[in-house]
Regions:
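Basic, flexible Lys/Arg- and Gly-enriched helix-loop patches that mediate nucleic-acid binding at interfaces
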Residues: 1-203
């Protein structure tokens, strides 16, 4: 309704089903984390860390989940605590997509095996999607999609079925994609991307 005043710090506005963020101090960023960088905002041992890439920003940011040091790719950073909590909470089943280079060849049956579930001491894990992207001499590039957030879970899954990871890159979280973003760069998420994250967690 035109002429209605709202409190930008507390109001929740939706336009055509998309949540609009009114607070000017809220940031949503995407980092393409390089290999060897630790998923911490500071490191007392002086190792490269995620915080190095956003040290010049005024807002206090935190990373949404983690990637281990040897894993590359998409890592979200924000000061929106509620959104970050929801994205990490297993009940929202937010999908994450990975590209993994593994020893090959990869049998056609592997996708069925991973979708059916693999049992570990800390419980079973099943992928939401799996496909072979490229077959190469002695190795293969595979895509793994899953909502599970357990530590090292992609590496554990593929090692368990006989294809230990040689290289791992996270390429998407929900509908936010890494695309052609260069390693070590940070970009601001677009309004549609933020809207997609909000929808993924029921906001």
């Amino acid at each position: 309704e035109m002429g209605v005043r709202v409190d930008p710090d507390n109001a929740v506005i939706h336009v055509d089903g998309m949540r609009l963020e009114l607070r000017s101090d809220v940031e949503h960023l995407a980092l393409n984390k390089p290999r060897g960088v630790h998923s911490t905002m500071s490191d007392d041992r002086g190792r490269p860390c995620v915080g190095d890439y956003v040290a010049d920003r005024a807002q206090r940011l935190f990373h949404v989940g983690r990637l281990d040091a040897d894993t590359e790719g998409l890592l979200l950073l924000t000061n929106d605590g509620d959104l970050a909590h929801r994205l990490m909470h297993p009940s929202y089943r937010v999908l994450k997509t990975y590209l993994a280079e593994v020893p090959g060849p990869v049998p056609r049956s592997l996708g069925r095996t991973l979708r059916a579930g693999v049992h570990f001491d800390d419980g079973p894990v099943a992928v939401d999607g799996f496909r072979v992207v490229q077959a190469m001499p002695g190795k293969a590039l595979v895509e793994v999609v899953l909502h599970e957030g357990r530590k090292h879970i992609v590496r554990r899954l593929l090692a368990e079925v006989g294809h230990p990871v040689l290289r791992l890159v996270r390429t998407a979280i929900a509908d936010v994609r890494l695309g052609e973003q260069r390693p070590g760069t940070v970009r601001v998420l677009s309004r549609p991307e933020v809207g997609a994250l909000n929808r993924a967690v029921g906001r």
